[in-house]
């Protein structure tokens, strides 16, 4: 209990929040790297999952990346660190390996969840394959894709602490510095900040996902009615 109180005291000290190594700066670094990883992973996983889901080709890749979730991120980071050296390159690579599978799986599942009758009806009225993707399948998959983004973001925001393993970056510095100097109050305080960021981000993404699901259902109903009328 005394260590926990010391951690709260550490958090309540204004000096720990300011400066280049303060909580605010480290939090901004942490969130910035998380955002970068999710964006890069999305640029890879969303188009790939969309194409695989639409064409049915390359499904093995979804299974293979799903199996990659079992690979420990710290192990990937260690190997990447030996290869790429000190800096952000190694944690960026390791976090991409962590973030791509849930995004790819969610996108693939979302695209394939579109009723085949709806897709066939879209083809019957003359829509091209890109139009079917853009106007039918992708909007229908938006809810599941948002859930995948939420899952990937939470995993990354929790694991970005490992970036401090090879770089003086992010909230993980409080954990590693505290462990090195046996300043457990700093370690617990840093962990509390990470948890708070994760919970706040989860709440925001849950709200966005809920709204997307509502809009997706409305869009799907309107699209189905429109296709039926066209036929």
Summary of predicted features, one role per range:
Residues 65-67, 82, 159-194, 213, ...:
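Glycine-rich helix-loop "coupling/hinge" segments at transmembrane-helix boundaries
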């Amino acid at each position: 209990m005394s260590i926990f109180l010391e951690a709260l005291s550490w958090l309540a000290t204004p000096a720990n929040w300011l400066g280049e190594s303060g909580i605010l700066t480290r939090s901004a670094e942490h969130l910035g790297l998380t955002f970068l990883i999710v964006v890069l992973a999305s640029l890879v996983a969303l188009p790939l999952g969309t194409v695989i889901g639409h064409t049915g080709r390359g499904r093995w890749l979804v299974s293979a990346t799903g199996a990659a979730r079992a690979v420990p991120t710290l192990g990937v980071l260690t190997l990447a660190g030996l290869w790429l050296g000190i800096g952000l390159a190694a944690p960026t690579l390791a976090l991409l390996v962590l973030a791509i599978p849930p995004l790819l799986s969610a996108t693939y599942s979302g695209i394939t969840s579109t009723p085949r009758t709806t897709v066939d009806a879209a083809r019957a009225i003359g829509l091209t394959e890109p139009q079917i993707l853009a106007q039918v399948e992708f909007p229908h998959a938006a809810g599941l894709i948002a859930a995948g983004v939420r899952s990937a973001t939470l995993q990354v925001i929790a694991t970005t602490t490992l970036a401090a393993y090879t770089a003086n970056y992010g909230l993980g510095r409080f954990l590693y510095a505290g462990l090195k100097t046996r300043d457990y109050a700093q370690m617990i305080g840093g962990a509390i900040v990470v948890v708070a960021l994760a919970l706040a981000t989860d709440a925001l993404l849950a709200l966005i996902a809920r709204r997307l699901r509502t809009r997706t259902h409305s869009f799907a109903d309107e699209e189905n009615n429109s296709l039926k009328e066209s036929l």
